[in-house]
């Protein structure tokens, strides 16, 4: 952005190179504040290489500045990281592609000049809205292109007829035409349409410059001849980096997330990355990930996957070289020797950020890597991920700490008046329970658990997807079932029989199931926790040995819609039911990716409920912490009330009539029916959310 790069004059720019520079200038002036731009220039020019007046960054400078492990340049003394976390080449590849925006097909890979880096930061931090007003806030296609290898597809007939030796020869030929360190996947034509879903960002950029014709010229690459795929090795390296830095906050040190990881932490990060990769087909894992599959998986089941790149590249907007207490001149024109790169020291005592609050138990399921995995798709009221919305997770219930009693479950969970996450971990019946055989699944419950039937609340914004439930599987393969949007727009007539969550001491926990009318009628008109006369009669006769009448079976929850989860009353087994034939009915929409079996049976090893504490924007602005913990204080108040009520019940004296045993039993039965004393005072018949 100097005199040599000026595009001013009577003639408007007409070449891709000139238009690219002009777009960078607009990005710089409209997407950054003057202070941010000053810091950006200092960071770039103080580290840039100089070749005959041409200033640029190479891969080593980029990796060192961002504190990203790079196996090519990282010294052994900086070790303590897994080689598979060496994402430096992947990030450099992405940046070189994005720096050529919007002419990636003719100018990529670009040299990392200041103009190129401006476009990179704007695109990866999603600041382009001020310039590209018609640009859709969707970078999926652009990011796919930055990761994908482009090669000439093998025809189906040749793919089937030729032997493995000829295939290897073709692979070797194509590999020689690409950058070292990245494999090019040779694959059959997957009907990838180069022009499908036009790149809205690129079109908006060229429309703002009145240069659509130049853009069309740039697009004249035969989409029928060339196809693009992301190699699994490239995608795995990026996934491991994103999982490691998911908790990263703006201007927070990156090194505490990317270096000095223990072997257990490295294994945990790799495991989460592998579960995401396992969600693609075997053919894609072998030959490369297609755009259609990548776009659908990321957009629906991993909408926040690339969020960690925003705070990572925002480091370029703050320079430690600048001392704002005094004026500095010529900072942007200084030589590399005058401003050597400042190495960020690793603070051994500094711990990575965690959103898990201390409480009554430590999780046997959640690890930092698994929480990072959850942050890639779970919603938050702010529209951002779990980390960027400042959400905290409070331990509510654990079978390890509180036992497998539904009474204990009610005591801890039904008193939590905020959204929650249910996490179940186990293995298929008969398996040995090794880490590779573990199955981890769960549900996001946006409403507090309630002891009585209630319809869906629609007071929130109709576009607030954080108020939709989610059903998901984490291990061994990633798959998500988002909540049905109709839950926000209408009050479904079936809400009474298809609640999001149904709880019963008889049948257990049901999520997304249809509840038979007979089960609903037994508690419809008697209020929360108050058993109907029929229930009380059955309970009384069962305790008296009248099992013949009690054998009248109560029909349990019925799987309904695209997905349902049923947990038995002993919290010992769970069943995940998936349907790919259902329409728009049910609590959840179809699983994405569609790789789950129709029925999954697991023996439960651990079950945990984690409460979600969302920051109150009004209180947060004042700086207080009272409201953010209000759900915790409400739960404690409920426990104290229950304790007082239990003491009060102990003091109730039943004195009616002459005080005979018969009259005493009748009076006591009446109080039990009212839910005031006895087991029913603590064991409510059921409830739903």
From Swiss-Prot:
Membrane-crossing segments per the record: none
Subcellular location field: Cytoplasm
Pfam families with a match to the protein in the record: TLD
Principal location class: cytoplasm
SMART domains in alphabetical order: TLDc
Basic and acidic residues: bias regions: 154-173
Domain named TLDc: residues: 364-613
Residue stretches in coiled coil: none
Composition bias type Polar residues, residue spans: 543-556
Region (Disordered): 154-180, 328-347, 519-564
UniProt entry keywords in alphabetical sequence: Cytoplasm
GO CC terms of this entry: cytoplasm
Superkingdom, taxonomy of origin: Eukaryota
Family the entry assigns: Belongs to the RTC5 family.
Chain's role: May be involved in a process influencing telomere capping.
Protein name from the UniProt record: Restriction of telomere capping protein 5
Lineage: Eukaryota, Fungi, Dikarya, Ascomycota, Pezizomycotina
